[in-house]
Amino acid sequence: MPLITLPDGSERRFDAPVTVRDVAADIGAGLAKAALAGRVNGRLVDTSHLIEDDASLAIITDRDPEGLEVIRHSTAHLLAQAVKDLFPSAQVTIGPVIDNGFYYDFAFERPFHPDDLEKIEARMKELAKADLPVSRSVMDRDEAVDFFRDQGEEYKAQIIADIPAGETISLYKQGEFIDLCRGPHVPSTGKLKAFKLTKVAGAYWRGDSSNEMLQRIYGTAWPNKQQLDDYLHRLAEAERRDHRRIGTELNLFSIQEDAGGGLVFWHPKGARIRRAIEQFWFDMHERAGYQFLYTPHIANLDLWKTSGHADFYSESMYEPMEDDNQAFQLKPMNCPFHVLVYKDRLHSYRDLPLRWAEMGTVYRREMSGALHGLMRVRGFTQDDAHIFCREDQIEAEILRILDLTLEVLQAFGFDDFDVNLSTRPDKAVGSDQIWEHATAALKAALEKKGLDYSVDEGGGAFYGPKIDIKIRDAIGREWQCSTVQLDFNLPERFEMEYVAEDNSRRRPIMIHRALLGSVERFFGVLIEHYAGSFPLWLAPVQVQVLTITDRQDDYAREVADRLRNRGIRADADLRNEKIGFKIREHTLQRVPYLLVLGDREMETNTVAVRTRSGEDLGSMDLNQLSERLAGEIASRGRSHLED
């Protein structure tokens, strides 16, 4: 007679073992119809799961985050069933849930084409409409291996063969299709009402480039058509803003395969933006009391052994290079170099805090399949800073860092943040006292700044607690950029010291800090946030001077020179093209201001001003215009003229 306790604390007793579906029906017909799965004593199960003893139970519907995951996982299986129906020789491999959707990898003799995806999706809709019951069964490992080998599914057999002997293997069946899965799944395929296949790509079996290439079909699934349509709209908007496409259109950067994937080439316009970003960064840090370092790109292998990178980070580092009987490696991080600068001389407690910053280029080994434009690269510039301070200075330094972080991010147009504090994990270096004091200092600083934050208990690195700040872009996506990380490990490894007030030697506290993260990645985020229409202070060309005929060429050169002398990035287009063609071309290049020069403007020493949005601002005196533009650039705001 199981006693079922529901999330609201109410209880229901049954005379015999009951399924999750039975309990939902006992509560109400509407809930029974909506039920997708259950959570029994904290574990997700199918609605067919039999409850024999007293238990807590939550009925999972499409309103629950777990319900959406069940829908997506079940839709991945629906995809696999459709592929097997249409292409019987295809072998199924894995089909996990990912952010906003799912994928499934197939081994097939040829690549899937877009028209294949249309056929597969149509078959999925037929299978969903058929409302096929989904049932779970179990086998032992060896039986399951034999079963899938008999089906010609060698990849599934390999997956199961890697599972420890003695473990029970669960299988799910819908129609004639059977697949390996832990579950849970929806009760029937009719619960899958809103899905879309989005793309196909190559993927190596088990992510290993030495293995065979598979076909990965991506898709998305939602509780209803409205949510699906909303997501597809966001997807289309993200595609419109894709930094790789815009970067090519605006001639900002490229990845040259002749040089190697994941290595960024900054073109002149992109370099202009990078210089603007970096100059602002240097100015802000100078004002905040930082000093700047420049450090090498390689170091002796012994340094990476001392820092721990050789033991714990070697998979992300490039192989050592032998030279003069020494082994050198490209740096994956700047931190040990800053430590060496600190150790170059003995410091007093009066010297602290020391705030050192560097735009340091680092190199990390990435699988080619993981590379993605500017967002995931092999060589990138980190806006690193390290603060060396006393324990009693932690809170004040964290406050200063938060002030600087928010000011910098807001200057780039990001005002919406998610803040997370990660605390001590089970295995950690440093005393309980220092962890408690440091964590309390981080919390106090966040609260003094009035920042809402979530706490990830036990989610910190083994060497110290940290604060992560995620920004939201124009279409609501989150990007991890800023990190504040305390480190109790490197000061110990490198035996860092300062002379305390009582003449004793003590370890300094080391704070790692990045505001932008990777400059390349942050640039990619900026491109997508603004869809290439950068605010005036960041635009690679802020003003484009356009002539109607060659009679205005000298005046155009003069106008461009005068603007450049005011620190405004201005170019002159003197080509023998129609003015309408020039206006359209530079509008597509997202130039904030177009100055059209004809005979009248030349005679009156004025300029006709247009914005990239197409607004005609009329004739203006150049001095007046340059004053206003220079003011806007200096304030790093959006142009009031364009607004």
Curated annotation (Swiss-Prot):
UniProt keyword terms in alphabetical order: Aminoacyl-tRNA synthetase, ATP-binding, Cytoplasm, Ligase, Metal-binding, Nucleotide-binding, Protein biosynthesis, RNA-binding, tRNA-binding, Zinc
Reaction catalysed by this enzyme: tRNA(Thr) + L-threonine + ATP = L-threonyl-tRNA(Thr) + AMP + diphosphate + H(+)
PROSITE patterns: AA_TRNA_LIGASE_II, TGS
Keyword Cell membrane: no
Enzyme Commission no: 6.1.1.3
Cellular component GO terms, alphabetical: cytoplasm
Source organism, top-level taxon: Bacteria
EC class name: ligase
Cofactor(s) demanded: Zn(2+)
Cofactor comment: Binds 1 zinc ion per subunit.
Residue numbers binding Zn(2+): C335, H386, H512
GO biological process, one term: threonyl-tRNA aminoacylation
Renumbered residue ranges of the record's region Catalytic: 242-535
Gene3D superfamilies, alphabetized: 3.10.20.30, 3.30.54.20, Anticodon-binding domain, Bira Bifunctional Protein, Domain 2, Threonyl-trna Synthetase, Chain A, domain 2
Chain ranges of the TGS domain: 1-61
Alphabetized SMART domains for the sequence: tRNA_SAD (SM00863)
Location of the protein in the cell: Cytoplasm
GO molecular function terms attached to this record: ATP binding; metal ion binding; threonine-tRNA ligase activity; tRNA binding
Any Pfam family matching the protein: TGS
Family to which the UniProt record says this protein belongs: Belongs to the class-II aminoacyl-tRNA synthetase family.
PANTHER family: THREONINE--TRNA LIGASE, CHLOROPLASTIC_MITOCHONDRIAL 2 (PTHR11451:SF44), THREONINE-TRNA LIGASE (PTHR11451)
Assembly behavior: Homodimer.
NCBIfam families from the UniProt entry: thrS (TIGR00418)
Function: Catalyzes the attachment of threonine to tRNA(Thr) in a two-step reaction: L-threonine is first activated by ATP to form Thr-AMP and then transferred to the acceptor end of tRNA(Thr). Also edits incorrectly charged L-seryl-tRNA(Thr).
Name by which UniProt lists this protein: Threonine--tRNA ligase
Organism the protein comes from: Thioalkalivibrio sulfidiphilus (strain HL-EbGR7)
